[in-house]
Amino acid sequence: LLGADVVPALAKKLNALAVVTDMSPLRIPKRWVEEVSGALGEAGDSRPLFQVDAHNIVPVWTTSDHHETMARTIRPKIHARPDFLGDIPELTPNSAGTALGKANDWKKAQASLDLDLTVPEVKWLKPGAKGASDNLQSFIDQRLKNFADLSNDPNENACSHISAHLNMGQLSAQAAVMRVKASRRHPDGVKAFVEQAAVRRELADNLCFYNNNYDNLSGAAGWARDSLQVHASDEREWTYSVQELEEAKTHEDLWNAAQLQLVREGKMHNFLRMYWAKKILEWSPSPRDALERCIFLNDKYELDGRDPNGFTGCAWSVMGIHDMGWKERPIFGKIRYMNYAGCKRKFDIQ
């Protein structure tokens, strides 16, 4: 990972015409870009620094100039820009070649990063560009037909399973949407996929780009923040420590199963991710603790963790981001409620 202490000297050594960086709306990567920009300026370097939003289909600053509060407000803005689904040009090789002067010291590179190496790697998902492409194709061939109707049932294998590839830059959302649309099969599935991969995903980036408090209660709408505060001291029938949650030692089998899948596989079904976070709100000493725990566990174990979608999912579940007020009840206040009985009605929990 090249930072402000490396980039100016490297750009000078390579006689680069410009420095180009990707875009992430999250706080830490945004700070990295600011630090590199500042270092170039301090070094008296006149090379321009370009930031390209390859994270989204439509650049986040092009879609909207403010925080969008609902999917329905950003949806027409995304669909109004089909020009961003134009053909991706073939990469033209340059004459520099790929030979390296010396082998990279990957252990040194890894040691320079703040990583939690206690979480074991998983085997079920093949990484890299080829693994991502193969996984997307298997979705188109086998699961797209059921995506619209069955993707909310954890018992069905109807999800795309590409969120980790998108998160790690092994697959672009633009390429994924274009390939799914080009399949010309299962129009309901295609529509549902575009909603998730384009509208919902870019709504998450919009939140993190324009709301600096995307990971704390200050980022909530007034109605949600006030409601949670009113009910912050409500009596909880069940409360658990972070360790008990992490080790899936609660009284509820469904929640424990979801948590165990998260720890063992680095994933959790999308519907259960909502339920999982709602229960953490119900079983934590306070809403602030609940949000911190959701983000901690999500980022530690999810293959698609530390991503705008993850922060937004936690924020939706705990503090009502992109949602409206619901019937007031203990602990949750006006935040949308989910419970075990509702899951039993929706799918076979056994």
Predicted ranges, named:
Residues L1-T92, G189, L260, K279-G313:
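Trp/Phe/Arg-rich N-terminal binding region typifying the photolyase-homology
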Residues A4-P8, F147-L150, S227-A232:
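Short hydrophobic/aromatic-rich motifs at helix boundaries and adjacent loops
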Residues D22-S24, V52-A54, K77, F139, ...:
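Structured loops at beta-to-helix junctions and adjacent beta-edge loops in soluble globular domains
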Residues D45-R47, P59-W61, D65-W223, K346-Q350:
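Glycine/tryptophan-enriched, flexible segments
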Residues D153-I349:
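Active-site-proximal binding-pocket segments
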Residues I28, G128-G131, T250, L254:
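Soluble or luminal CAZymes and related metallo-dependent hydrolases
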